[in-house]
């Protein structure tokens, strides 16, 4: 057998809350509902939501070049597309995930009031992809979310046309004290080298809005 065991471990307890709501409103009169999901670990917006202009970047260097004068009081929109030419798609994912993970931290350094990121998805569709993000001590915490690739294209096109685009956005997520969970451990002891170890790992948990079948049920 596999000698299954459970190992107690404390894990973060973050709750999404009510369904997120977002709209974009442009100076040219466009108003479109945006498909949005709070990033795991994000704070909420104010209870009444927030509204601020969007400024688009693709890289950390873009943030640095724009500086606080251009960014302060705005929502930073990280719009780096995944590269479809990589055969191993994790390479494309790995290049873009830095903005989801640390975008709120880096944007806040320049006075941004929020951060949104293009979903890490090679397709153009209406489905936002959540994922983990982080905050750092001594850096202001700002809300962070992912928008669908279709909505990312709409926002980017409007900005490219020179329009002022504002995001009206509300999310109510919150973080509670850590809660107990378990690592699941299985062991198949070899016959030839029973005291040597080959370690394989994966995750059985999934995001609250997913089913976990392919991330990472299939992987496990």
Regions found by a protein language model. Give the residues of each.
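Extracellular/periplasmic catalytic domains that process cell-envelope and extracellular macromolecules
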Residues: 15-16, 46-50, 68-72, 108-110, ...
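Second-shell loop/turn segments in exported
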Residues: 23, 41, 45, 52-57, ...
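Noncatalytic luminal/extracellular "stalk/propeptide" segments of secretory-pathway proteins
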Residues: 1-75, 79-87
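Catalytic-core environment of secreted peptidases
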Residues: 1, 68-70, 74-96, 114, ...
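Solvent-exposed loop/turn segments at secondary-structure junctions
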Residues: 12-15, 61-62, 82-85, 120-124, ...
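Short alpha-helical segments and helix-capping/turn motifs at coil-helix boundaries
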Residues: 7-8, 19-20, 60-65, 98-105, ...
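Loop-rich non-cytosolic ectodomains and luminal regions
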Residues: 70, 104-165, 212-219
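Short Pro/Gly-enriched beta-strand edge/turn motifs at strand-loop
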Residues: 2-8, 162-171
